[in-house]
Amino acid sequence: MLLNDYRPVYVIGIGLHRYQAATETSYVQLGVTAVREALADAGMEWSSVEAAYTGTTRLGMAVSRPMLRHLGATGIPMTQVENASASSSSAFRLACRDVAAGFSDVVLAAGVDKAGKVNRGEQLTGIAPHDGGLVVPSVHYALLAEEYMRASNVGEEVIARVAVKNHLNGSKNPYAHRQRERSLDEVLGDRPIAGSLKRLECCPIGEGASAVLVVSDAAIDRLGLDRSRAVQVLSSTQRSEELYGAKSFDVELTKTTTEQSLAEAGIRAEQLDVVELHDAFAIEELQYTEAMGLCGPGQASRELANGEFAIGGRVAISPSGGLLAMGHPIGPTGVGQIAEITRQLRGEAGPRQQPNSTYGLAHLVGLGAVCVVHVLAAAGR
C-alpha cells in the first residue's frame, strides 16, 4: 500500500512534553500533557479522535488505556506499538494508513517513555543489548567512527562538529533535553564512552512524550480546522534489514528506505529543506546524510564544516537538536521528529526556523533492523 494511492493524509495538531532526565513525573502525566497540547494546537476536542496508536518500549502492557482515559473514556480502539527506537514512527505510520484507507478521519499517534534502571552504556542509546551486556551499541558506533575516520582520512574533530551543531540547535528548543551550546573543545574534551566517542557525541536518555493528530480532508472540513496549518504526509515507508554484505547494514537500510520514500513522495533528495534523522551517535549523522543522497559519498564532513547542514544552510539537518540534544527517550522520539518537521513546514519554529521550508523528511532506525522514513510537505506547496 502506497500512501498516495489512497486519500490525502495530513498532520493538523502537534504536542510535546519536554524530553528530560528521569523524574517522579508519571508517564500518564507526560503523555496527557503532549496529547492535550496537540488537541489545542489543532483546535479540536478529544471526542473527535476516532483511534489511537501509542509507541512505547519500557512501560509494560496496555499503556494507552490508563493514559488516555484521563481525556475521556470514548471507546475508541487503542493500539500499543513497540519497534525499538522506531516505535512511535511506526505508530505514526499506522495512523497514516488508517486515515488514508478511510477507516478513520482523525487518529492520534503518540509516544511516551520513562527511563528504567539500566547501565550507563545502554542508557546512551536506549537500546538494551541482547548478549548479556557484553556489547552495547556505543561500542558498535565507536568502531564505525574509527572506520569512517580511516576511510575519509579525517580526525575526531569532524565527528565532534555534528555534536556542536546539534547542541546549538537544541539550545534554541524549549522541548530539548540538552539546552546548552557546546564548543568543539568541550565536545572533544568530554568524558570518553567508547573508543573515540565522547559523552556529548552520544544521545541522552530520559523521559518525555509526543503526540500528533492525523486527519483526512473530510475531517478538516467537518471540524472547521485551519487548512493552512495542515501539513501533508506524502509518503510513509518502512523496511527491514536484508543481507547487504556491507560493513554498516543500518546505513544500507537507510539508503534503500529513503530512496523508496522519496520515490513514493515524487521528490528528489535535493528538494528537501529540513531533515530529522537518527543521530543517536554523532557518527550516524555523517553516515546517514550520505546514504540519503543529501551529499555525495565521503562529502558529509566537508559540507558540515561549510555550514550546508546548519539552520539557514542548504538543508537543515536535525534543527530540533536531533537525538544528540533534543534527546532520545525512545518511545516519543519518532513522533517528536514529525512534530518538528510539521513546525518547520508551517514556519512556526522560531529561532530554529529553516527559511522557506517546503519539504521535510523524518528518519529513524529501530535496533538496526527496521527503518521508517516519512516525507511531508507544507500546505499550498
Question: What is each stretch, according to the model?
Answer:
Residues 82-112, 138-172, 212-218, 326-349:
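Active-site-proximal alpha-helical scaffold in enzymes
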